[in-house]
Structures are given as C-alpha cells and as structure tokens.
Amino acid sequence: MNLRRKNRLWVVCAVLAGLALTTALVLYALRANIDLFYTPGEILYGKRETQQLPAVGQRLRVGGMVMPGSVRRDPDSLKVNFSLYDAEGSVTVSYEGILPDLFREGQGVVVQGTLEKGNHVLAHEVLAKHDENYTPPEVEKAMQENHRRPQRADKDTSS
C-alpha cells in the first residue's frame, strides 16, 4: 500500500468514527425526549410485532378511552384516578392537575407519563382527543343563529 492510499484510509476511518460518535451523542441527548406510544393492550401483552413489554419506570404515551364509571376525583386536591381501556384490556392512570375541558368518560385521551408497578401509569400530561367534526359550543350557537331561515318577504308583519 502506498502512502496516498494509507492517508485516504485514515481519512475515511476518521470520518466514519466521527459520524458514529455524532450519532451516539444525538441519540444520548434525545433519549430523555423519546416517549414510545402504547395502547392499554400493548402495556399488558406487549407490542404486536415484538411482544416486548414496557419496563417499569419507562416514559411513555398511552392512548385509549376513559372507562365509564372509573373517574375518581380527590375532593381536597386536583388528583384524579381513572382507567384507560381498549379492545384488549385496561390500565389505571393517576394524574394531578387540571384536566382538559374535553375530558370525560367514554372520550379518547392520550396520557404522557411513566409506567409504575401493576400496570399503573403516573401521568404528567393528559390530552383529550376529539374527532374532526368537533365544533366549539360558542361556534355552534353562532352558526345556528346565523343560519335561521329569514322571515318570508310576502308575509305582512305590520298587523
């Protein structure tokens, strides 16, 4: 091997090592912001593809429906406990804070938090889902008022 090829080999190796180091540092920095999405059934039985269960203490997002009759509010604080369910099972959730206006039983929600023992999620954030047809009540009222039928022009209103 001549000197020119050796220099090229060293440059290529240095560039590859630099890329590997950069990738490792980026992944290390982002690990605190990576939250995997699970459904209640996937927490209980694992992801469909890998059958891998989330670890206790893992940060995650859980999406499901609020089980009717499961919402329990602490009268002395903002603590709320409820169950999320899907077709495969349910998990319990604890949250302390103000819930979104759209939060109610039977409604779809996404909670972000950490998995505790016993399939319990300690939520740090609760997001209520709504469908694409949602209209705020104020807008609905305004639309109803604006779309009233006009009075007939041939009707005599003076008598």
Curated annotation (Swiss-Prot):
Record topological domains on the Periplasmic side: 30-159
Transmembrane segments: 9-29
Bilayer disposition of the protein: Single-pass type II membrane protein
Topology feature Cytoplasmic, residues: 1-8
Pfam families reported in the protein's UniProt record: CcmE
Region feature (Disordered): 129-159
Alphabetized GO MF terms: heme binding; metal ion binding
Subcellular locations according to the entry: Cell inner membrane
Primary localisation category: membrane
Disulfide cross-links: none
Domain of life: Bacteria
Gene Ontology BP, a term: cytochrome complex assembly
Residues noted as binding heme in the record, renumbered to the chain: 130, 134
Gene Ontology annotations for the cellular component aspect, listed alphabetically: plasma membrane
The entry's keywords: Cell inner membrane, Cell membrane, Cytochrome c-type biogenesis, Heme, Iron, Membrane, Metal-binding, Signal-anchor, Transmembrane, Transmembrane helix
Membership in a protein family: Belongs to the CcmE/CycJ family.
Purpose of the protein: Heme chaperone required for the biogenesis of c-type cytochromes. Transiently binds heme delivered by CcmC and transfers the heme to apo-cytochromes in a process facilitated by CcmF and CcmH.
Name of this chain's protein: Cytochrome c-type biogenesis protein CcmE
Gene assigned in the entry: ccmE1
